């Protein structure tokens, strides 16, 4: 028995597709903006069904990598079958990244009690690439549709996809509040921005819920672990646009354009 308070076995992880920037994610519209061929699903529906069912039988919820909305659609089909077979299941599965989920898909995620874990940092690093090459200038505004997820009642967190980008919850929260490219400074989908309070919930209580640890972590309550961070100021009242934390540095927005800001951050070692 090697499980303890710091090393908990209650989830499995599988991949349903690849990455959008690698042109291997599976998209509903069958091709990329550049004309590149659609990525393939890794499993057929029956195989994924068998995997999820076996995981539940052994006491595991499953986090499922779904970058493209074609992969998200597959998860919705499969979990619906699972719930029709076992409607009283206690297991909560999660779609990871879920970057192009449609309004209809978000509604069904809520209905099936499937959690979502958005790659909040993505637009900061790849927003310009997605606008020009992978999904186009319209669809990029719908990437990481966190405001829509709130509207549909989806429980969700956010992440950095380490080691793709570094673990830094406050930076991920900043990205979710601003949706700004770190290269061009363009904002992609302002109507999908979160408030600071919503972003903080994503990296605290919602994150604990996704891990089935909400009875121990995620909020300051009697009986829960004293697992919290003391910050220099009230995050929900801070200027969410003016600066952010990255690699241990607080980067305050300088005078000039965002390219200069990125260059300054690189000079500081971030």
State what each model feature region is:
Residues 1-5, 85-86, 241:
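Short, conserved catalytic or adaptor-binding loops enriched in Gly and charged residues
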Residues 44, 238-239:
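Residues that cap or delimit alpha-helices
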Residues 53-63, 70-93, 97-98, 103-107, ...:
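His/Asp/Glu-enriched, well-ordered alpha-helical/loop segment
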């Amino acid at each position: 028995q090697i499980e303890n308070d710091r090393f908990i076995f209650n989830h499995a992880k599988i991949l349903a597709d690849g990455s959008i920037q690698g042109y291997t994610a599976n998209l509903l519209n069958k091709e990329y903006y550049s004309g590149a061929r659609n990525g393939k699903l890794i499993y057929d529906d029956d195989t994924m069904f068998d995997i999820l069912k076996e995981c539940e039988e052994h006491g595991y919820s499953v986090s499922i990598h779904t970058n493209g909305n074609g992969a998200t659609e597959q998860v919705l089909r499969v979990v619906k079958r699972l719930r029709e077979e076992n409607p009283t299941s206690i297991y909560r599965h999660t779609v990871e990244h879920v970057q192009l989920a449609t309004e209809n898909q978000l509604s069904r995620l809520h209905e099936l009690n499937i959690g979502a874990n958005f790659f909040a940092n993505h637009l900061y690093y790849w927003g310009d690439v997605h606008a020009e090459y992978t999904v186009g200038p319209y669809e990029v505004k719908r990437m990481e549709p966190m405001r829509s997820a709130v509207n549909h009642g989806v429980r969700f967190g956010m992440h950095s996809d380490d080691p793709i980008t570094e673990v830094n919850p406050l930076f991920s929260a900043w990205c979710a509040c601003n949706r700004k490219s770190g290269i061009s400074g363009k904002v992609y989908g302002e109507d999908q921005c979160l408030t600071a309070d919503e972003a903080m919930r994503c990296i605290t209580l919602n994150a604990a819920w996704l891990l089935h640890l909400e009875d121990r972590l995620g909020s300051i309550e009697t009986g829960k672990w004293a697992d919290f961070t003391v910050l220099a100021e009230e995050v929900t009242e801070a200027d969410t646009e003016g600066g952010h934390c990255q690699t241990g540095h607080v980067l305050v927005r300088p005078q000039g354009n965002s390219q200069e800001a990125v260059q300054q951050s690189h000079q500081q070692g971030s």
